[in-house]
Amino acid sequence: MDEKDVATQPQETGQNPRLSGQDEDPGRPEGAEAPPSEGALAPHARRSEAVGPKPPAPGGKLLSLKGDRAFQRLRKGRAGRGRYVSVKWLPAAELRVGIVVSKKVGKAVVRNKVKRRLREILRRLHLPQAHLLVVASPEAREADFAELFRDVVRALRKSGLVQ
């Protein structure tokens, strides 16, 4: 039988050789339950119903500092400066971080690399609860991870956030 012949042969009603039945799953053993059809998350993976922001887990994702007002408030915060970064912070109920890397640092790929490094450094430090702003200087593009790490710690010590 030719492929042309298959396409032109009349189909029996309700029968399509390419589609299986609605409840039919060839990979599922007979009698096994179908997965739940309520949304994209499985029951064990549903989001918790807890209210309010959760503090970042040690080694977890950092919360971002957002909104112009939050950045304006940080102008009155405590400051510290290193060779590659300057930091400002204010005490807060939770740790939130804003990272600023200007176009003077370089093109987008370089700026994003500096931001990723700074985010990882701050994640590793397990900082106290504060709103923290980290501004990278153009020289930060030449610093390797270890130099940047030492400089961030130095700036945070000068500002009084860490000992």
UniProtKB/Swiss-Prot annotation:
Reaction equations catalysed: Endonucleolytic cleavage of RNA, removing 5'-extranucleotides from tRNA precursor
Keyword RNA-binding: yes
Gene Ontology BP annotations: tRNA 5'-leader removal
Domain of life according to the entry: Bacteria
InterPro entries in UniProt: Ribosomal_Su5_D2-typ_SF, Ribsml_uS5_D2-typ_fold_subgr, RNase_P, RNase_P_CS
PROSITE patterns named in the record: RIBONUCLEASE_P
GO cellular component term, pick one: ribonuclease P complex
Region of interest: Disordered: 1-68
GO molecular function terms noted in the UniProt entry: 3'-tRNA processing endoribonuclease activity; ribonuclease P activity; tRNA binding
Compositionally biased spans, kind Polar residues: 8-19
UniProt entry tagged with the keyword tRNA processing: yes
EC number(s) stated in the UniProt entry for this protein: 3.1.26.5
Biological role: RNaseP catalyzes the removal of the 5'-leader sequence from pre-tRNA to produce the mature 5'-terminus. It can also cleave other RNA substrates such as 4.5S RNA. The protein component plays an auxiliary but essential role in vivo by binding to the 5'-leader sequence and broadening the substrate specificity of the ribozyme.
Family statement drawn from the similarity comment of this UniProt entry: Belongs to the RnpA family.
Self-association and partners: Consists of a catalytic RNA component (M1 or rnpB) and a protein subunit.
Something else known: The open reading frame (ORF) for this protein entirely encompasses the ORF for the 50S ribosomal protein L34 (rpmH). The two start codons are separated by four nucleotides.
HAMAP family linked: RNase_P (MF_00227)
Name by which UniProt lists this protein: Ribonuclease P protein component
Source organism of the structure: Thermus thermophilus (strain ATCC 27634 / DSM 579 / HB8)
Gene name linked to the record: rnpA
